[in-house]
Design a protein with these regions (language model features):
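Short, polar/acidic, helix-capping and beta-turn segments at strand->helix junctions
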Residues: 1-118
């Protein structure tokens, strides 16, 4: 993926959790998380979309998408959610399975993204 012009914006630690939460994390903030990977994927990508919009960007501005998952159960369905989110847009992507995310043990997915806006 080659991007020219615009402003590079980095997004890190995007999960299905509420975008504004306490640090250090409070367990009760994660009580409403769905327990399946596809649903958390949808919520995390919606949070990413809101963050993109906050800086004047869109999904089409994403040039790199990095995904960490704590389970591969539901991976195919999560991939379908990602394809729905991206539409015809194809940024560079990578997906890795990890033992646990630092946010909360109930978080199953975390996304980092790089976008070139403008």
């Amino acid at each position: 993926v080659k991007a020219t012009g615009g402003t590079t914006v980095y997004f890190a630690g995007v999960t299905a959790a509420p975008p504004y939460h306490y640090h250090p994390h409070r367990p009760e903030e994660f009580d409403t998380l769905p327990r399946d990977l596809p649903a958390q994927t949808r919520m995390a990508l919606e949070n990413l979309k809101k963050s993109l919009e906050a800086v004047g960007g869109t999904v089409e501005d994403v040039v790199f998408l990095q995904t960490f998952m704590t389970t591969m159960e539901g991976h195919g369905q999560a991939g379908a959610v990602r394809r729905e989110f991206l539409g015809e847009h194809r940024p560079a992507t990578t997906t890795m399975q990890v033992v646990r995310l630092a946010t909360d043990p109930r978080c199953l997915i975390e996304v980092n993204a790089i976008a070139v806006v403008g």
